[in-house]
Curated annotation (Swiss-Prot):
Lumenal topological segments: 30-475
Gene name per UniProt: FUT10
Keywords per UniProt: Disulfide bond, Endoplasmic reticulum, Glycoprotein, Glycosyltransferase, Membrane, Signal-anchor, Transferase, Transmembrane, Transmembrane helix
Name of the protein in question: GDP-fucose protein O-fucosyltransferase 3
Species this chain originates from: Gallus gallus (Chicken)
An individual GO BP term: fucosylation
C-alpha cells in the first residue's frame, strides 16, 4: 500500500512539473509573438524597420515565415497601395521599401479605407468600365505600362496619360524608365558565347539567305510586313514565323515559348543579318528584337524607335532602315556587306573587342534599380511598387510637418507614339492598305476616347460605359 502511494505521489509530481513547464513555454512564445508584432508609431502610420518581403525564388522560405507576422492587420498601421488591375495576384502583403513600409493588395474592398493612398494600374488591363472614383485629394494614380500602344491606345494621348501621378513605362522620361526591360545585362552583349565566325557564316550562306525574319504577330501598326514584303522582291529573306512564312523551324521550336531556347539561338546565329522590326514606332520602345541579334553576334537591321542610336552599344552596331529611301536601297547595301567580310565585320568590331562605347547605355544599366532574370535583384514591378510607396511616405511626412504635399504628374512624353503610317509602296497590296486604315482609324478613335475619359474622371464620380461612349461619339 505504501509503495502504491509513493508511485502516485511521484506521478503527481511529474505531471505538475510537466504542466508548469508547458505553461512557462507558452508564455514565452506569446511574449515573442507580441514583440514581433510591435512597431513604433509615426502619427497614425508606422514606418519601422521590417524584414524585406521580396518575391524571389531564393527567398521564398523567408517570405513564408515573414507572411505569418505581416498580414492584413497591417492595414491599420501602413498606407495601402491598391492594385486596381490584379497584376500581382496578391490579396495582401506588407512590403519593405527602404525605411518605408506599405501594404500592397488587389482587394478592392480597401478602396474606401482611410489608409488607402494610391491606386496602381497595369496599362494593358486599364479599362473605363470600373475606376476608383470619386478620387480624393490624397489618392495618387500610378501607371505601369511596358507595352506598345497596340495594347491600349487611349493611354498614349495627353488627356489620358496626364491623369496619372506616377509612371513606369518604356520611355526614358518616365518616373521609372523601363527602356532596357529586355536587356539582361551588359555582359550578355559582350559575350561571344553564341557567335559564329564570319568564315563559317559564308559557308552556311550556300543554304541560307543573308537575312532572317521571325514574326508571328502579323499586320502590326508599324506596317513592318509591308516593308519586308517589298524587301523580299530585292533580296532573299528566310522567314520562319507566321508572317510572310517561307521556311519552317523544327517542330519543337515553333511554339512562342521556344524563342529563348538555345537551339533557336543556334539557328539565328548562323545568319549574317536579322530583321529587327518593332510592332510600333515609339520613342524608346525597344524590345528583344534588337537585343537578341546583338547578343548572338548577328547584325540587326532595325526599324522602330526613332531615337535608337541613343541605345546602341556603338555607333556602328546596327543598320537603320530609316537611313534608306526604299527597301531596294537597303537590299543593295546588305548585298555589298554580304560580299565584303571586312565591311561586314566592321559592324561586329565592338562585340569582338567587348567595347561598348555608348555612355548612355552603360549609365542606364549601371543605375537601373531592377534586374532581368536575376533573382538577386528586385524585378521592375517590385521597384515600381516601392517608388510609389516611398513617394506616398514622403507626403505623409510633409503633412506631419505642416508642409504642402509634393505633386507628381505624368507628362505626354512618358508614352510617346505618333500616329501610325503606312509605307507608300504598301498601297499595291489591298489587304495591307485596309489594315493600315484600321490602325489609323483606331489611333484617331483613341484620341476621342482619351478626351472623353478625361472629362468623366474630372467630374469625379462614377460613370457608365454608356455615358463614356455617348461622349466619345458626340465629338
Amino acid at each position: 500500500m505504501v509503495r502504491m502511494r509513493r508511485k502516485r505521489l511521484w506521478a503527481s509530481c511529474i505531471c505538475f512539473a510537466a504542466f508548469f513547464f508547458l505553461l512557462v513555454t507558452l508564455q514565452v512564445i506569446t511574449e515573442l509573438g507580441n514583440s514581433e508584432n510591435k512597431a513604433p508609431a509615426v502619427s497614425s502610420l508606422h514606418s519601422g524597420p521590417l524584414k524585406p518581403d521580396e518575391r524571389h525564388a531564393s527567398q521564398l522560405k523567408k517570405n513564408e515565415l515573414y507572411s505569418n507576422f505581416r498580414t492584413e492587420p497591417d492595414t491599420d498601421h501602413y498606407p495601402i497601395l491598391l492594385w486596381w488591375s490584379p497584376l500581382t495576384g496578391e490579396t495582401g502583403r506588407s512590403g519593405q521599401c527602404g525605411e518605408d513600409v506599405c501594404f500592397f493588395t488587389i482587394n478592392k474592398t480597401y478602396q474606401h479605407s482611410q489608409m488607402t493612398r494610391a491606386f496602381l494600374f497595369y496599362g494593358t488591363d486599364f479599362s473605363i468600365d470600373s475606376l476608383p472614383l470619386p478620387r480624393k485629394d490624397h489618392h495618387d494614380w500610378a501607371l505601369f505600362h511596358e507595352e506598345s500602344p497596340k495594347n491600349n491606345y487611349k493611354l498614349f494621348h495627353e488627356p489620358a496619360i496626364t491623369l496619372f501621378n506616377h509612371t513606369a513605362t518604356f520611355s526614358r522620361h518616365s518616373h521609372l524608365p523601363l527602356t532596357t526591360q529586355y536587356l539582361e545585362s551588359i555582359e550578355v552583349l559582350r559575350s561571344l558565347r553564341h557567335m559564329i565566325p564570319v568564315q563559317m557564316k559564308n559557308s552556311l550562306r550556300k543554304r541560307l539567305a543573308p537575312l532572317v525574319y521571325v514574326q508571328s504577330d502579323c499586320n502590326a501598326p508599324s506596317d513592318r510586313d509591308s516593308y519586308v514584303r517589298e524587301l523580299m522582291c530585292h533580296i532573299e529573306v528566310d522567314s520562319y514565323g507566321e508572317c510572310l512564312h517561307n521556311r519552317d523551324l523544327p517542330q519543337h521550336l515553333r511554339n512562342p515559348s521556344a524563342m529563348d531556347d538555345g537551339n533557336f539561338y543556334k539557328i539565328l546565329a548562323q545568319y549574317k543579318f536579322i530583321l529587327a522590326f518593332e510592332n510600333a514606332i515609339c520613342e524608346d520602345y525597344i524590345t528583344e528584337k534588337l537585343w537578341r541579334p546583338l547578343m548572338l553576334g548577328v547584325v540587326p537591321v532595325y526599324f522602330g524607335s526613332p531615337s535608337i542610336i541613343d541605345w546602341l552599344p556603338s555607333n556602328k552596331s546596327a543598320i537603320l532602315v530609316s537611313s534608306f529611301s526604299h527597301p531596294r536601297e537597303l537590299a543593295r547595301y546588305i548585298k555589298t556587306l554580304d560580299q565584303n567580310d571586312q565591311e561586314y565585320e566592321a559592324y561586329l568590331e565592338w562585340k569582338l573587342k567587348g567595347d561598348i562605347s555608348n555612355p548612355r547605355l552603360l549609365t542606364a544599366m549601371k543605375e537601373r534599380k531592377w534586374g532581368v532574370q536575376d533573382v538577386t535583384q528586385d524585378n521592375y514591378i517590385d521597384t515600381f511598387e516601392c517608388m510609389v510607396c516611398n513617394r506616398v511616405w514622403e507626403n505623409i511626412r510633409r503633412e506631419e510637418k505642416g508642409w504642402l504635399p509634393q505633386r507628381w504628374s505624368a507628362q505626354v512624353n512618358h508614352l510617346n507614339c505618333p500616329k501610325p503610317e503606312a509605307f507608300w509602296f504598301s498601297s499595291s497590296n489591298p489587304s495591307q492598305s485596309s489594315l493600315q486604315e484600321m490602325w489609323i482609324a483606331s489611333f484617331e478613335q483613341s484620341k476621342k476616347e482619351a478626351w472623353a475619359l478625361r472629362q468623366l474622371v474630372e467630374r469625379n464620380r462614377n460613370f457608365t460605359t454608356q455615358e463614356f461612349w455617348m461622349l466619345v461619339f458626340k465629338q
